[in-house]
Structure formats: C-alpha cells, structure tokens
C-alpha cells in the first residue's frame, strides 16, 4: 500500500479552555496512530503542541517540508485560530483536511469548554477567502466510524494529488497515425499540471530491448516469470522478445525518472521485434508501473490517478469501451489486446495472438467480476475533466484479449458522454470504489469531475460522513 505522510496541526483559540485543547490534541494524535496513520506532529513547535500564533507558522512549514508531508489536518482542538490556519495552509499549498472533535455536553452551569464546531464554520469561510481548497470531515467523535473512514479517504485524496503533480510519462514513439483521438497537448499538460513527457524514438526502445536480451541474468529471471505467469501459446522463439521488451521498458522508465509509460504498439514495433507489446505491458502494469497502449498519454494519467486513489492496493486495467452486451441493455464490453495485470484475471492468462493483428505477444483472459470504478482523464480546447462512475462485472460471451463484460446504471447516458466528449474509447477500470476519492481530488488539481451516473448527491453525502 502506498505511504502518505499527514501533517497534524491541532489549533486552539485563547478564549476557550487551553487544557481541554491540549487534551484533545493528544487524544486525536493517539487515535490517528492507532488507525495506522503516519503523522508528523507539531508537538515540538511550542510547549502546547498547538497552532494559535503567527510565530508558529514558519517552523511548522519548515518541519513539514523537511519531512515530506503530503497533506495537513487542521484539528480544531477548541474553536481554533482561523486566520493562522489559513495562512499556514496557503503557504504549504497541500491538501487540507478540516475537522474538529464533537463537543461534549455543556457543564452544569452552562459553560462550554471548546466550541470546536463553531470554529470549523469560521475556518471554512476564511480558507475560502484565502482561496485554499479543503476537504471537510464531519464534526464527529474520535471513535465514530466516519472518523477513520474520512481520514483514510483524505489520505487517498492526498495520494492522487501527489501522484498527479509528480507525473512524468515515458512516451515510446509517436502516436499511431490512425489514432487521432489519442493526441494530446504536451505544452499545456506541463504548463497547467506540471505533467511531463519523456519522449523517445522507436529506435531507442528497440536498442534497449537488444541490450536487455544480452543480459543473461535479467533474461533468465524474466523468462521464468513469464513461464510462471502465463500459459504460453506462441512459438518459443518469440518469448525472449516479450521478456526483453518488458526489461527494456522498465529500465527506460527508471532512466528517465518516469512513473508511467505509453507505447505506440503498432506497426513499427512489429517490423523491428516481431511481437505485440501487450504481455510486456501487463508485466509492468503488475509492478505498479502503468504502461498504456496507442501512445495514449491521457490514458496513462488516468491509470496513475485511479491506482493512487486506491492507495496502490489494486492494479488498474486499461481498456476500450468496445461493443454493447448482446442481451443486457446496460452491458458493455471492456477489452484490450492484453495489457491487464495477472492479478486482475479470473484465470491464468494465455500468451497468444491478438484479435486484429497477426503477431504474437498479446494475452487472453477474462478479468475477475465484482464492483468496479471506471474513469477517464481527458480534455480538449483547453478544458479538462475526469469522467468517472461505477460498474460491476457480469457474464457475457467469451472474448479475445483481456476483457470483462460490465453493467452500468445507464449505458445510454455513458455512451453519450463519451461520444460528446472530451473523452475517447479508452478508460481505466479498477476493482474498488474510488469514485468519492477521485471526485474530491479534482478540487485540488484543477479539473472538473464528470459523473456518468446520477450519483453526485450520494457522493457528496458519503464525503460529508453520511
């Protein structure tokens, strides 16, 4: 599972009980550690370990940056000091979780010790004034289930934001000429999102494969992995090319400091190596290095986002929306020539030939059924959005490639969204419900969430703890 560091920032206000604020900052820190959160505390910033003065901001910022914090939690141990919270949040520029523990029953004489809820109202407004996006977790008790759920969902949001803003994609050759739908604006991706591409020509990839094939130790290990992972249904003399391509792509990803890749797939690669790249893609995808087809840069971005939203617990499946189910009005075939990781398959994949080409190197296997999230990051004309929603695996006719028949709530609505854009026929599926996390992450990365199901109010209700 991916690791996320949370900066823990408890805050108080002078007119309410300092001892009670100190008590709750300790209880909250203990609870966060109990549920497995890696926190960076401010208990060394001052004697109370609380934020309530401008002088605390600089040392907190310095500490959090040195520790590599990925997001911060503004914990209102009492009412809190809203303007100091906002100044800190703006200076850090990280995702913000706003929360305060539910207030106790007032004292017999009517005295209230904390008024944490009231402080949340104030801080929410001031964060807006400072134009700081934030995530609100409902005012609840530390032992309430929505506390643990909300914290972990926020950590997943932080993971999406961190991954998105640090994306660098290995682009292996140009897009295929016939695939105008996969064109992207490299300059705009860099200017708006800090998403970088590392383009290399096909000749560099082919040479890297030749170099890999000359490495006997690396080849022996990869060939053993292939024999263990796949049922081999292609000529034995073609398997080393699959192994060499997998090794080469991994080395190139590391050489250029990338976290994903996109490959041309056809036809130049077949002229040089005599194979399709699908199985090699699947091997890297299983490693947590998304490699997508047809040089689909936006598809690679989607794969990174979807896996980050699940904290790396499951692997994504880069797929085509292809044809409608012959019997189910809301059924659709997700399929591609074979880049899906083995962990997603319901059976041992066959290393074989693809549907539309004569060269070996594809995989065939039906994916596991179950509940899924489907997503697609895309854009055109300067506007970017994230199409997302739920689906479930269903039975259907046997297929070729890696495939899964799925059912959605309303296929006609989804179909119209894809056609009318800015999306294309590619998406990424994952065996997890990460719709709320992706929806919330969009506010931090400057894109619009676009739900293809009529569930927006349900998603908002989930996020606020209902």
Where do the model's predicted regions map?
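Cap/lid and interdomain-hinge subdomains that line or gate substrate/regulatory clefts
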Residues: 2-6, 39-40, 100, 104-221, ...
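Extended hydrophobic packing segments that form well-structured cores
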Residues: 358-466
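Long, internal scaffold/assembly segments composed of regular secondary structure
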Residues: 221-222, 228-309
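N-terminal beta-loop-helix "entrance" segment that forms/cooperates
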Residues: 37-67, 207-216
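N-terminal basic/disordered segments at the start of proteins
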Residues: 1-34
């Amino acid at each position: 599972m991916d690791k996320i560091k949370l900066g823990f920032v408890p805050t108080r206000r002078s007119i309410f009980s300092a001892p009670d604020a100190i008590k709750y900052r300790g209880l909250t820190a203990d609870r966060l550690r109990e549920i497995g959160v890696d926190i960076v505390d401010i208990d060394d910033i001052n004697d109370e370990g609380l934020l309530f003065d401008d002088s605390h901001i600089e040392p907190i910022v310095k500490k959090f940056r040195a520790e590599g914090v990925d997001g911060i939690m503004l914990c209102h141990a009492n009412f809190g000091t809203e303007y100091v919270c906002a100044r800190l949040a703006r200076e850090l520029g990280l995702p913000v979780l706003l929360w305060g523990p539910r207030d106790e029953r007032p004292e017999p004489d009517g005295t209230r010790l904390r008024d944490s809820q009231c402080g949340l109202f104030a801080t929410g407004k001031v964060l807006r004034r400072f134009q700081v996006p934030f995530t609100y977790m409902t005012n609840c008790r530390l032992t309430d289930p929505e506390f643990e759920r909300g914290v972990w969902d926020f950590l997943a949001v932080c993971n999406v934001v961190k991954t998105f803003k640090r994306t660098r994609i290995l682009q292996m050759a140009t897009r295929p000429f016939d695939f105008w739908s996969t064109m992207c604006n490299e300059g705009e991706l860099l200017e708006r999102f800090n998403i970088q591409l590392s383009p290399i020509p096909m000749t560099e990839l082919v040479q890297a494969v030749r170099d890999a094939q000359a490495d006997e130790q690396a080849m022996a290990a990869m060939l053993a992995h292939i024999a263990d992972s796949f049922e081999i249904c292609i000529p034995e003399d073609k398997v080393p090319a699959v192994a060499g391509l997998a090794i080469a792509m991994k080395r190139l990803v590391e050489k250029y400091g990338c976290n994903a890749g996109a490959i041309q797939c056809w036809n130049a690669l077949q002229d040089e190596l005599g194979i399709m790249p699908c199985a090699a893609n699947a091997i890297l995808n299983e490693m947590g290095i998304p490699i997508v087809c047809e040089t689909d840069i936006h598809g690679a971005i989607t794969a990174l986002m979807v896996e980050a939203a699940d904290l790396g617990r499951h692997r994504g499946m880069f797929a085509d929306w292809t044809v409608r189910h012959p019997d189910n009005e809301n059924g659709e075939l997700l399929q591609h020539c074979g880049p899906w990781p083995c962990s997603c398959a319901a059976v041992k994949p066959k290393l074989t030939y693809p549907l539309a080409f004569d060269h070996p190197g594809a995989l065939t296997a039906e994916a596991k059924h179950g509940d899924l999230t489907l997503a697609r990051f895309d854009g055109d004309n300067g506007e970017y959005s994230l199409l997302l929603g739920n689906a479930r695996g269903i039975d259907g006719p046997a297929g070729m490639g890696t495939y899964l028949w799925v059912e959605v709530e309303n296929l006609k609505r989804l179909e119209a969204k894809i056609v009318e854009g800015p999306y294309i026929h590619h998406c990424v599926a994952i065996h997890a419900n990460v719709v709320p996390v992706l929806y919330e992450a969009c506010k931090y990365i400057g894109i619009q969430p676009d739900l293809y199901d009529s569930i927006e109010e349900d998603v908002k209700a989930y996020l606020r703890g209902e």
